[in-house]
Amino acid sequence: MGKYFGTDGVRGVANKELTPELAFKIGRFGGYVLTKDTDRPKVIIGRDTRVSGHMLEGALVAGLLSTGAEVMRLGVISTPGVAYLTKALDAQAGVMISASHNPVQDNGIKFFGSDGFKLTDEQEAEIEALLDKEVDELPRPTGTNLGQVSDYFEGGQKYLQYIKQTVEEDFSGLHIALDCAHGATSSLAPYLFADLEADISTMGTSPNGMNINEGVGSTHPEGLAELVKEKGADIGLAFDGDGDRLIAVDEKGNIVDGDQIMFICAKYMKETGQLKHNTVVSTVMSNLGFYKALEANNITSDKTAVGDRYVMEEMKRGGYNLGGEQSGHIILLDYITTGDGMLSALQLVNIMKMTKKPLSELAGEMTKFPQLLVNVRVTDKKLALENEKIKEIIRVVEEEMNGDGRILVRPSGTEPLIRVMAEAPTQEVCDAYVHRIVEVVKAEVGAE
């Protein structure tokens, strides 16, 4: 990660850390790096429903126009919608203004290259080098060479028509409950599922600029679980603020997370001959029950570091077409170049329809191990990982587990924390393992 770019673009509190001045520079320098080899390049911009989106969009557009780029504004649209349209509209770059599942005061800017994929580390480093220069030496076109701006608010519909054709038949006879987090999918998802002839009930579809992710969406699926039970729905689908995540709820009101959704997709894709190299890519945070369920179905798993960009890198490297995270980022690389909540939702409902099985039965084929994650504030993350007493307690606990559980001790990527996670057959055993390790970490390198 660089000075400005984190694992998912540039993020910060809007108008404090992510200022219009910085957004202008990101537009100018980012636009230049991605389009310098093209005459009159085209750049598309989408945003979620945050109140700061208009402010940052205006600054970004100005920066891009100052390099001579033609800018097309898509309005409110999901992140995967921008990724798809960047390639579909032959744009040289796409930009999404969103902080995903973060609270309303945050916002972010992420770029997509002409192929619809997020930027490489090298491209981000090139943009950062320009941002840090004291003098802006980039060309400044004038007159008719300046860029112009246009609106293409139909882009959302073009994207919906594309993902809609990935399913085999309509969803008539199904009652689907939707939670759109008052975010980018608020008008898109209800239209999509109604268009597929499902009966729908909705929540989180009244964005006012201030309420994105507030007690709703994929990070707060409890409200959707209540709606499913109240309406007698067959399935609940919860998206996050920018629509790149999906968490589901079965017909009984049980939450179905990203690991379970990946397993359901993997099993169905294998049975129908669609799972490339018989492999699913996931992160080290996926539940042990996920790996055991894959193993029982003779499906291979490939693990990466935490973060959907690392999942994507491994998928591209190995030629795999299914990957994701427990948090609900599901990547279906045959169709879209990033995690896509609505596309994942379509596939999940399609599998229910094709197998004639309720979601509870499909998800029940994977038994989740109880899991506990505790964050310990430390003085030095590096010292913690090298500490002999910490290494010893991890070794002792792993020996006691004897393969019937899992320990993961890793540093936070952004804070002075060590994350201690365990999975075991019962919650009681799981909690005991974690607290034994946490006590040693605190005694050796604890900051409090």
Curated annotation (Swiss-Prot):
A GO molecular-function descriptor: magnesium ion binding
UniProt cofactor note: Binds 1 Mg(2+) ion per subunit.
Uppermost EC category: isomerase
Catalytic activity: alpha-D-glucosamine 1-phosphate = D-glucosamine 6-phosphate
Gene Ontology BP annotations: carbohydrate metabolic process; peptidoglycan biosynthetic process; UDP-N-acetylglucosamine biosynthetic process
InterPro entries hit by this protein: A-D-PHexomutase_a/b/a-I (IPR005844), A-D-PHexomutase_a/b/a-I/II/III (IPR016055), A-D-PHexomutase_a/b/a-II (IPR005845), A-D-PHexomutase_a/b/a-III (IPR005846), A-D-PHexomutase_C (IPR005843), A-D-PHexomutase_C_sf (IPR036900), A-D-PHexomutase_CS (IPR016066), Alpha-D-phosphohexomutase_SF (IPR005841)
Modified residues (Phosphoserine): S100
Cofactor: Mg(2+)
Post-translational modification: Activated by phosphorylation.
Binding site for Mg(2+): S100, D240, D242, D244
Pfam families from the UniProt entry: PGM_PMM_I, PGM_PMM_II, PGM_PMM_III, PGM_PMM_IV
Purpose: Catalyzes the conversion of glucosamine-6-phosphate to glucosamine-1-phosphate.
UniProt xrefs under PANTHER family: PHOSPHOGLUCOMUTASE (ALPHA-D-GLUCOSE-1,6-BISPHOSPHATE-DEPENDENT), PHOSPHOHEXOSE MUTASE
NCBIfam families cross-referenced by the UniProt entry: glmM (TIGR01455), PRK10887.1 (NF008139)
Protein name (Swiss-Prot/TrEMBL): Phosphoglucosamine mutase
The species this protein was found in: Bacillus cereus (strain ATCC 14579 / DSM 31 / CCUG 7414 / JCM 2152 / NBRC 15305 / NCIMB 9373 / NCTC 2599 / NRRL B-3711)
